[in-house]
Amino acid sequence: MKLIFLHGLPGVGKLTVARELAQLTGFPVFHNHLAVDLAGSVFEFGSPPFVELREKVWLATFSQAAAAGLDGLIFTFAYDRTVRGGFVNEVMKIVEGEGGEVLFAELRCSAEELERRIADLSRKR
């Protein structure tokens, strides 16, 4: 399995790029906020149980996808202070352990564009 690991600041366009890549590749998108929202519905953001549950969801998804023989998966990720230091290495270990490959792509944009994107109503919940 090819895991396309899109990372960058919040609002930089990871989900937009992921959706376009999904159209081109046929790979499903695993949006970071699916795990964040799940853990956050039960635990306070950043609390030890939140961090543990979020990471378990992320890693279990990668493990199951790789073991199931998916051709690929697109993951959106924004590092924050609550992410365990060894997380990325654990992702690589899981995917590569199943014969897969992790492809990292950092997304960036200008400060002006980032400010515009964050202010965009579509980002408000």
Model-inferred region functions:
Residues T16-A66:
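Conserved substrate/cofactor phosphate-moiety recognition/catalytic segment
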Residues A35-V36, D80, R108-E113:
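Conserved nucleotide-binding/hydrolysis micro-motifs of P-loop NTPases
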Residues L3:
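Walker A (P-loop) ATP-phosphate-binding motif of ABC ATPase nucleotide-binding domains
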Residues V95-R125:
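A glycine- and Lys/Arg-enriched "phosphate-lid" helix/loop adjacent to the NTP-binding pocket
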Residues L70-F75, G99-L103:
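Loop/turn-to-beta-strand initiation segments
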Residues G13:
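Conserved glycine(s) of the Walker
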Residues L6:
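Hydrophobic anchor at the beta1->P-loop junction of P-loop NTPases
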Residues P10:
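The conserved Walker
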